[in-house]
């Protein structure tokens, strides 16, 4: 069965919009676990636009599933992760002006920096994932860097302008998921997935986990957070039925 990682970033986005103490991303994470989430994903950005350090610290001791911490490959963030010791860390690219992560980590270009980070995190007992575009070269670089897991960036698929273009992107993800799996990696995927486009991705047999957040938070406005998680979990189960 494919796992569902629920990203709680945008619960924190609502909180930070007014500088209040609510809604609590910690509470959202605990509700998501009860509703069937297999992991909780959260991105501690350098600009701290949503998730804050204290959210990570509190959740680390309260989660019953797994914490998947997303972070940039910086000394500050790697040191923080080594101190907190999440179950998993997904290294992502980051630009302050972006609305959300816009593409995969260029492991080829930043190979030395990524390799050092992978080694350091692994020595701290943290499983490392690299968020990469669905390209063989990036997958090969991830293997060489020592990452046991990759997360394929599904943004181009999610943002495709036509059904035909989306199908092309889907085939690319299918091909690269199989390629990465064949190279011995655990293969996850995420970015831009929602209730209308997730089943096709979840049906790819080599994928182990999907990380989904914005769509679940948006759906929760109308049906509640627990039900939004349950509905997404049902779609993943449907895809593997």
Swiss-Prot record:
Q: Which residues form a coiled coil?
A: none
Copy the pathway line from the protein's UniProt record.
Answer: Cofactor biosynthesis; pyridoxine 5'-phosphate biosynthesis; pyridoxine 5'-phosphate from D-erythrose 4-phosphate: step 5/5
Query: Which biological process terms from the Gene Ontology are attached to this UniProt entry?
Result: pyridoxine biosynthetic process
Q: Where in the cell is it found?
A: Cytoplasm
> Which controlled-vocabulary keywords does the entry list?
Cytoplasm, Pyridoxine biosynthesis, Transferase
Q: Where is the active site?
A: 43, 70, 191
What's one Pfam family the UniProt record gives for this protein?
PdxJ
Superkingdom of the source species? Bacteria
Task: Outline the subunit composition.
Answer: Homooctamer; tetramer of dimers.
Q: What is this protein called?
A: Pyridoxine 5'-phosphate synthase
Tell me which species this is from.
Nitrosomonas europaea (strain ATCC 19718 / CIP 103999 / KCTC 2705 / NBRC 14298)
Which classification does the entry list for the species? Bacteria, Pseudomonadati, Pseudomonadota, Betaproteobacteria, Nitrosomonadales
Q: Which gene encodes it?
A: pdxJ
